[in-house]
Amino acid sequence: MGKTVVIKCGGSVLDELSPAFFASVNAMRKQGMEVVIVHGGGPEIGQMLKTLRVPSEFVNGLRKTTKDVLAVVEMVLSGKVNKQLASMLRQHGLPAVGVSGVDGGLLEAEPIDLAKLGYVGRVKTVRSQLLRTLLAAGYIPVISPLGIDQNGQTYNINADTAAGAVAAAIGASQLAFVTNVPGILRDGALVAEATAEMIERLIEDGVITGGMIPKVQAALSALSDALPEVMIVSGKTTFYQNGTWHGTTIRKEVGVYL
């Protein structure tokens, strides 16, 4: 079995994925890598909630998920976004299979705070055997970030943290967060490498702002001894070619690569 890469595609970038993105995934596969994709769908969920007039609110950056909101989240993530992304991958010659984190109990979840957040969960266990079976058969699993507990209750899971949990469970050699920019930018120039300390400073200095803040925080929290570096890359341009990654590499500390 070759190296396994987990790619997380945010909901806001899905409509902007370019042919270069799919070419990058193809390049990985040609190098013998296995690929797993975890996707979000925030903008689509927000639009559907508005269309259906289902009230919703955010608490500490997470969408409070009532039963009504959860029904829409499931419909959009698993019924629409997941299938669209799997279809796009197949159109580019990539053998994708769309699955929900609920399927086969792939993502076993537990509530973060039922009173404050409703059915928002965290990943308790990843049943990685399902992913290993799909990978061994040559498929690219495309996962919508829903989880299920032992009582059969479904939970809405943050896609960034779901991707980190999947990467840890399958022993991925790389985790890449796909955004609509080439990585962390300072004065328009790409920051090729960053550490936790540097990122803290870049946030304080207003270099890292808005939606990039939760991305880099998710990247930092995914770092471990088994996964010493994480990438932030663009879905609009080539991010992997001839064995080389293009984007910002995030590591825990400078000593790792000096």
Swiss-Prot record:
**Could you tell me the Gene Ontology terms of the biological process aspect for this record?**
arginine biosynthetic process via ornithine; L-arginine biosynthetic process
- What Gene3D superfamilies is this protein classified in? Acetylglutamate kinase-like
Where substrate binds, per the record, is at 41-42, 63, 156
- Enumerate the subcellular locations listed in this protein's record, separating them with semicolons: Cytoplasm
Which terms does the record give in the GO molecular function aspect?
acetylglutamate kinase activity; ATP binding
EC number(s) stated in the UniProt entry for this protein: 2.7.2.8
Family under the similarity heading: Belongs to the acetylglutamate kinase family. ArgB subfamily.
Q: What does this protein do?
A: Catalyzes the ATP-dependent phosphorylation of N-acetyl-L-glutamate.
Which protein is depicted? Acetylglutamate kinase
What organism is the protein native to? Geobacillus stearothermophilus
